[in-house]
């Protein structure tokens, strides 16, 4: 991995190639508040950016956080999970900065998680409803990675009303 300076907070992972050059997917355990805020803000996830302390607690308490960075160390995207690492893995967040959409970054992040949690009975995530523009894009993306809706798996999912 020439050209990379891996700091102690990062565990080197798999490499992917985005159209702009090599991308490193790595586990991170220490998070720069401003950098994480900028990434969540770039995709307009106000539910996170409206309470940055809570966002940082969520990152710290995740089972796994992986990032995608370019050769200069710029954060391109990240994904995080909540898991018992035995039966269930829930993909909590997958974000890619809009400047890097449609370059394979999100795919590399999710493929890394699929491999990491292949032993789990359930590998789940939630996304926007397909009646929304973002939902249509997300559904197509996750389907291209082999995901099925709960209904297609003859399952149901339930949730309480959103707390704002």
How does the language model describe each region?
Residues 55-95:
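A conserved beta-strand-loop-helix scaffold within acyl/acetyltransferase catalytic domains
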Residues 3-49, 153:
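Short amphipathic alpha-helix that is part of the acyltransferase structural core
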Residues 33, 49-53, 107, 136:
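Structural motif corresponding to alpha-helix initiation and N-cap regions
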Residues 107, 119-124, 129-163:
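Conserved active-site alpha-helix within GNAT-family acetyltransferase domains
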Residues 96, 102-115:
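Conserved acetyl-CoA-binding loop-helix of GNAT-fold acetyltransferases
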């Amino acid at each position: 991995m020439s050209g990379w300076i891996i700091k102690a907070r990062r565990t080197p992972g798999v490499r992917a190639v985005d159209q702009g050059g090599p991308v490193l997917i790595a586990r991170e355990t220490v998070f720069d508040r401003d950098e994480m805020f900028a990434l969540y803000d770039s995709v307009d996830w106000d539910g996170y950016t409206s309470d940055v302390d809570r966002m940082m607690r969520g990152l710290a308490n995740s089972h796994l956080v992986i990032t995608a960075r370019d050769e200069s160390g710029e954060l391109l995207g990240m994904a995080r999970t909540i898991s018992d690492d035995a039966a269930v893995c829930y993909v909590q967040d997958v974000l890619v900065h809009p400047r890097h959409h449609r370059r394979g970054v999100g795919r590399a992040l999710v493929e890394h998680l699929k491999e990491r949690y292949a032993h789990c009975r359930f590998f789940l995530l939630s996304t926007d409803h397909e009646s929304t523009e973002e939902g249509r894009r997300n559904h197509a993306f996750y389907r291209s990675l082999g995901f099925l809706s709960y209904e297609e798996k003859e399952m149901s999912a339930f949730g309480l009303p959103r707390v704002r």
